[in-house]
Amino acid sequence: MGQKVNPILFRLPVNRQWRSIWYADKKTFPRFIWEDYQIRKFIKKRLESAAVAKIVIERAGNRVRINIHTARPGLVIGRRAAELDKIKEEIMEIVEKGREVLVDVKEVKHPELEAQLVAENIALQIERRVAYRRAIKRAMQLTMDAGAVGIKVRCAGRLGGAEIARAERYHEGKVPLHSLRADVDYGFAEAKTVAGKIGVKVWICRKEDIATVVG
């Protein structure tokens, strides 16, 4: 079970929280789901270079609060909060009229321990034509140096421009996917190369004391 399912979803009742925090009836539920998807899609595209680890959306009454967890808060906020105001205005066009939109920026203090950021970094290095093995091993070393218990990386596609697609796995330390108490983070990214897309999956097991800081 632990090998097949998404590690974050698998641990939701134990040591993970939902990234969409709200309740809705049957009529408004589809609208909220669509809005959340569009908001996340817009933020990830707009802040592609800002190292956004996750986006948490909270709804209460007519208020929509969006928490952006990023390793580069300065890029998100901008000079005199100009960039943040622009993001807020564009999000207001996505959500239903009459709703109050609040955008909070939270700094990620340990980007090397965020699986999504590690996966995106590896994918970016592959797109820049860095050898995939070198990119993966360097990312794994940085993660272990940051205090991780273990890391597992799976890279699949036409690796190195090969004619036949294949998958390779790299592992260091301990990543207990079946242990619900273990704080395992998961991330996925795609590298768009001349030969085609290369998928990168990353699992990171963090220490309990670090997990309380990272969230």
Swiss-Prot record:
Keywords: Ribonucleoprotein, Ribosomal protein, RNA-binding, rRNA-binding. Binds the lower part of the 30S subunit head. Binds mRNA in the 70S ribosome, positioning it for translation. Belongs to the universal ribosomal protein uS3 family. InterPro entries: KH_dom, KH_dom-like_a/b, KH_dom_type_2, KH_sf_prok-type, Ribosomal_S3_C_sf, Ribosomal_uS3_bac-typ, Ribosomal_uS3_C, Ribosomal_uS3_CS. This is Small ribosomal subunit protein uS3. Signal peptide: none annotated. It comes from Methylacidiphilum infernorum (isolate V4). Residues 39-109 form the KH type-2 domain. HAMAP family: Ribosomal_uS3_B (MF_01309_B). GO terms for biological process: translation. SMART domains: KH (SM00322). It holds the Pfam family KH_2. GO terms for molecular function: mRNA binding; rRNA binding; structural constituent of ribosome. One of its GO terms (cellular component) is cytosolic small ribosomal subunit. It comes from the Bacteria. SUPFAM superfamilies: Prokaryotic type KH domain (KH-domain type II) (SSF54814), Ribosomal protein S3 C-terminal domain (SSF54821). Part of the 30S ribosomal subunit. Forms a tight complex with proteins S10 and S14. Gene3D superfamilies: 3.30.300.20, Ribosomal protein S3, C-terminal domain (3.30.1140.32). The keyword Cytoplasm does not apply.
